[in-house]
């Protein structure tokens, strides 16, 4: 009898408190970059009942109306009703932003290599901090993402679409999903074992109605029928009631959903969050570059799955390490893949920014439903434009 292996990932909706915070931080980043592409931004947000606090470090020539950006973002998410305990019109907004530390700025604005006389424009920017970052890709889905996180994202995105379109009128913005996938002996996904969905709702609707609508209009519309069978388990609002939600139910903070933002736990994570950070922060830009590399490796047929680790020292342009792990699935040696990667991808912060055009205001759209594997928006790190070059270099 074959061994039954299960893997579970979760996602949360744009109305989840932590995701509200992420979206506000990235909306502020985008507003600044739209006026000043050279800005350095580290914007953190805390949300709770009736209040938003924005704090962090920013160096920019731009003027941004933080109050307006915060309120517009909250309204777009759907918190426009005072009954929710958190509303765009009535929430208190408390910004506390200061200039970036000069000690940090001197290493970011002029990398160690430039200070030592290595005259190259791409040596001008040093990494904004030390750290390690991971990127991952796997051939389980067309977007080369693990199936559990892919389905989890699509479920909460479908809930939001139905709420915003008015197709399900009783839904409120906060929601969570969790999908457990069963794998066979060859590590191929064969079925969905369990689906958990908790969705905020108006007080008068019955749980029977919610269960019916979520199964019929969300789950069955998102998960392919080939993965569903009579033994698939559904837990819909298993507490029995979810009226109080969003920041009224729980406080939210930027950077607390880093596993949701990436691969749902299927790959390793370096620990750094993304939202509110400009591209000189390698927590963000190098994670995108690592995904870009991993996705092109898998798309080129060099491996069935690939994990890329990058690591940096603060104020230094060149990464201190590059590691490729294909978990025994590669068709060529990992050493050859790593050599090709080093030759093809400039992994200095300025090189990544140039390669992926990261000075643009493109970040708010990534702050809910995942930064990786998105098929609904155009993201530069999801491009497959290095596939042929990788094949040619490796032969």
UniProtKB/Swiss-Prot annotation:
Membrane-crossing residue ranges in chain numbering: none
Cofactor(s) essential for the protein: Mg(2+); K(+)
Positions of the UniProt region annotated as Flexible loop: 100-110
Alphabetical list of Pfam families matching this protein: S-AdoMet_synt_C, S-AdoMet_synt_M, S-AdoMet_synt_N
Enzyme class, spelled out: transferase
Record note on cofactor: Binds 2 divalent ions per subunit. Binds 1 potassium ion per subunit.
GO cellular component terms attached to this protein's record: cytoplasm
Binding site for K(+): 44
Catalytic activity field: L-methionine + ATP + H2O = S-adenosyl-L-methionine + phosphate + diphosphate
A single MF term (Gene Ontology): magnesium ion binding
GO biological process: one-carbon metabolic process; S-adenosylmethionine biosynthetic process
Listed NCBIfam families: metK
Cited function: Catalyzes the formation of S-adenosylmethionine (AdoMet) from methionine and ATP. The overall synthetic reaction is composed of two sequential steps, AdoMet formation and the subsequent tripolyphosphate hydrolysis which occurs prior to release of AdoMet from the enzyme.
Protein name: S-adenosylmethionine synthase
Record organism: Streptococcus uberis (strain ATCC BAA-854 / 0140J)
Encoding gene per record: metK
């Amino acid at each position: 009898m074959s061994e039954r292996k299960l893997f579970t990932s979760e996602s949360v909706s744009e109305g989840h408190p932590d995701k509200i915070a992420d979206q506000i931080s990235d909306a502020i980043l985008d507003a600044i970059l739209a006026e000043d592409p050279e800005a350095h931004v580290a914007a953190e947000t805390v949300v709770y009942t009736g209040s938003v606090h924005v704090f962090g470090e920013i160096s920019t020539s731009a003027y941004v109306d933080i109050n307006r950006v915060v309120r517009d973002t909250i309204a777009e998410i759907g918190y426009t009703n005072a009954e929710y305990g958190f509303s765009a019109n009535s929430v208190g907004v408390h910004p506390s932003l200061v200039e970036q530390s000069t000690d940090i700025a001197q290493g970011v604005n002029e990398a160690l290599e430039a200070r030592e006389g290595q005259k190259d424009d791409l040596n001008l920017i040093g990494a904004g901090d030390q750290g390690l970052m991971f990127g991952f890709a796997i051939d389980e889905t067309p977007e080369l993402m693990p199936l559990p996180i892919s389905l989890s994202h699509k479920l909460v995105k479908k809930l939001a679409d139905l709420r915003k379109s008015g197709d399900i009128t009783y839904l409120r913005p906060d929601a969570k999903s969790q999908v457990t996938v069963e794998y066979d002996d060859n590590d191929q996904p064969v079925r969905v074992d369990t689906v958990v969905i908790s969705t905020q709702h108006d007080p008068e609707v019955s749980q029977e109605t919610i269960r019916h609508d979520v199964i019929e209009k969300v789950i069955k519309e998102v998960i392919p029928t080939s993965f569903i069978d009579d033994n698939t388990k559904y837990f819909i609002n298993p507490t029995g009631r979810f009226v109080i939600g969003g920041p009224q139910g729980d406080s939210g903070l930027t950077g607390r959903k880093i596993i949701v933002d990436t691969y749902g736990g299927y790959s390793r994570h370096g620990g750094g969050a993304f939202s509110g950070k400009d591209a000189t922060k390698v927590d963000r830009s190098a994670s995108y570059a690592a995904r870009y590399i991993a996705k092109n490796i898998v798309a080129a047929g060099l491996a069935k799955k690939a994990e890329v680790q990058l690591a940096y020292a603060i104020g230094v342009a060149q990464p201190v390490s590059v590691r490729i792990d294909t978990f025994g699935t590669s068709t060529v040696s990992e050493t050859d893949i790593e050599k090709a990667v080093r030759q093809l991808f400039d992994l200095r912060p300025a090189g990544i920014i140039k390669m992926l055009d990261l000075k643009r205001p493109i970040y708010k759209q990534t702050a809910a439903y995942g930064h990786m594997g998105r098929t609904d928006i155009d993201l530069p790190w999801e491009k497959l434009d290095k596939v042929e070059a990788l094949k040619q270099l490796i032969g």
